[in-house]
């Protein structure tokens, strides 16, 4: 197993241009596929999750051209649904942002489609989405365990009508349903059961759908109306914002050991909720400066916070390791959906924080973190989870440094993360 030793860093300073957002990249690729016309996507993320989506689209007959560095994609839209005369099997790795939307989109056309992935994907729930699609007439069969991939879709199109979907586990289910609803055979009314998690991710979806010319009526996130007879139309060009979750590591670095760290590609005009991570750092005591397309974090003594972070679940992980450098006990609440991500992130985070000496209380949907007087060095297991590796890079700011096991797992969203991270050292 590959290991990366991060020696203690005294201070950081610099500027990082953040790679494209995973959430926006895969949503935009799918909408461009369903749209009339050719779309040029710029600042597309070049990572495993995007490659799985692109490979699947190519297998389904979608034509596109990538630039030499894979960050510009010119894609010819199908002007409607994806169909296939031959049965197709699509391998989607551990990419939830490809599995969930494709599962929904493939019900719109004609054909037999089997969706598979890595072993961890078989543990990541999809039942709430499948239940909703079945209410609209979809024929979907589980191949192993009910509620989980792999699965086969026997597609004949999707009916309109009223549909209920559970909202308190993952916003990706609602995102997938929203994106396919305009191409159903009639108007769709989506009723959300329970409290909707990660609302800002739904805002991303709605903003992109509007960019492609589709109207959705949002009734306070409890009900969504999607009128019939709509079509996606390419806006011509789509600029993929920098990934706000990826920005969180560099902003935290500035807050803990700045100096001054500036991230570009994301700022106050962002459609991503994870930019609110900077507000949490500010509550902890960091000096934050906002521009339209940049954020600057400057170091200051940090103090613990006790906050509901349901709206920024991915970026909230960075607060868990930043808490090791804050005075007092930090509590991160309402984060049950950490448990259904690339790994059970609540359990993994608690385990690894304890290795460096933190006192940790792991609840069903919260985590309490009290830093030790002196942090220990340790070998951090990353659970094939890109965010675990990036979060624990913050331990380079301890006097003892840290060793990251399997650092290449960052290829899921940020292949050269550790190169960029090293560039901040003073």
Swiss-Prot record:
CDD domains in the record: EPSP_synthase
Subcellular location: Cytoplasm
Gene3D superfamilies in alphabetical order: Enolpyruvate transferase domain
Listed InterPro entries: Enolpyruvate_Tfrase_dom (IPR001986), Enolpyruvate_Tfrase_sf (IPR036968), EPSP_synthase (IPR006264), EPSP_synthase_CS (IPR023193), RNA3'P_cycl/enolpyr_Trfase_a/b (IPR013792)
Entry annotation: catalytic residues: 314
GO cellular component entries: cytoplasm
Chain positions recorded as phosphoenolpyruvate binding sites: 22, 96, 124, 172, 345, 387, 412
The protein's enzyme class: transferase
Primary site of residence: cytoplasm
Residue sites binding 3-phosphoshikimate per the record: 22-23, 27, 170-172, 198, 314, 337, 341
Catalytic activity entry: 3-phosphoshikimate + phosphoenolpyruvate = 5-O-(1-carboxyvinyl)-3-phosphoshikimate + phosphate
Pathway it works in: Metabolic intermediate biosynthesis; chorismate biosynthesis; chorismate from D-erythrose 4-phosphate and phosphoenolpyruvate: step 6/7
EC number: 2.5.1.19
GO annotation terms (biological process): amino acid biosynthetic process; aromatic amino acid family biosynthetic process; chorismate biosynthetic process
GO terms for MF: 3-phosphoshikimate 1-carboxyvinyltransferase activity
Database matches in Pfam families: EPSP_synthase
Subunit structure: Monomer.
Function: Catalyzes the transfer of the enolpyruvyl moiety of phosphoenolpyruvate (PEP) to the 5-hydroxyl of shikimate-3-phosphate (S3P) to produce enolpyruvyl shikimate-3-phosphate and inorganic phosphate.
Family: Belongs to the EPSP synthase family.
Protein name: 3-phosphoshikimate 1-carboxyvinyltransferase
Gene coding for it: aroA
